Amino acid sequence: MTLADNKTILLVEDNPDDAKLTLRAFQRSNILNPIVVARDGIEALDFLFARGAHSDRADMPLPTLIVLDLKLPKLDGMGVLRAIRAEERTKLIPVVILTSSKEE
């Protein structure tokens, strides 16, 4: 199964173990879309807005879904979400917010 004609999913997760767990969950659910992993908030926005290392994707379609961690380096998940919602081109992309926390 794929979402929206095999469009890309953007996973924004800095913890490699959590990213691996999320990718495995997609795989076990037979979601076969290509998945791009961004390791921090700035990398996620660079991917979405075709900046920096991702400037070569300016003409490529946006992801069909964003899975976003809240606790990220460089720019937290809420900052990423605000930037996504502030732009006409990205404001309607569905965003699923996930986070894990170890409280003692």
Kindly label every feature range from the protein language model.
Residues 32-39, 46-48:
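Short hydrophobic/Thr-rich beta-strand motif most characteristic of the beta2 strand and flanking loop
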Residues 40-43, 61-64, 76-82:
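Acidic catalytic/metal-coordinating carboxylates
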Residues 69:
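Active-site residues of response regulator receiver
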Residues 73, 82, 103:
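The feature encodes the CheY-like receiver
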Residues 53-57, 78-91:
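Short amphipathic alpha-helix used as the core "switch/output" element in two-component signaling
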Residues 37, 72-75:
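Residue-level signal for the "D+5" position in two-component response regulator receiver
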Residues 13:
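Conserved acidic carboxylate
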Residues 96-99:
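Hydrophobic/aromatic residues positioned on beta-strands within the core alpha/beta folds
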